[in-house]
Amino acid sequence: MATGVWVVESSLHDLDGAVTFEQRRFPKLIELHEELGSLLPKETMTIAGPYWGMNLVLWARGLVKFAAIGLGNAYQYHIPGGPPPPPANKRVALTALRRWAVASPDLKQWIQKNLNERISKTDPAHAQFLEVERLIERAMNSDDLGRRQIARFYKEWFDKIASAPHSGRALALYQDLSSAYVLGKTLTDLPKNEPGSRKPDRVARQLMLNCL
């Protein structure tokens, strides 16, 4: 008998911000894990992902024991032997927004504009964005720098939620994403070369609405 179950929706790239995510795809994924949880023995090892945020949502809600994450340029599962993934853009994590974006001169200008016009210097997000802005040019010219910055942020994000008691992790993740959503609502749209949603708040909002 199997002692573990690993479930991943390979077509789901939860950073895309598609309008179907929050009302249909994310709830359906949650329902699937709820049903599995009702059928599997309690001691079964359960794993979800890799995704960007839905793995954390499922884990924080107690629907899986482990959240699988991506390594490299994609937080998404690619089926072995399937079509090769498209060439990856070089990205950086926008830590205050709980998402990533393509590292480009346009992103650097976008950050500078919002730092000057939208984000107070007393806001902790100001220092976070300033750090990213200083990284972008080097990330554009490196195959590794952006990946390391994203991985470092992701570990810090995971550790923050993991520090909450088991029963409070879903609420902790909700509150964390809520702060990112509120900030994102005040910012201008991301550059036109961003392949996912250009709305700074959308990724956090869609994940937040499925935390509880």
Regions found by a protein language model. Name each.
Residues 55, 73, 89, 114-116, ...:
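Detector for Asparagine
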Residues 120-212:
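C-terminal extensions of enzymes
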Residues 33, 58-61, 94, 133, ...:
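Intrinsically disordered, low-complexity regions
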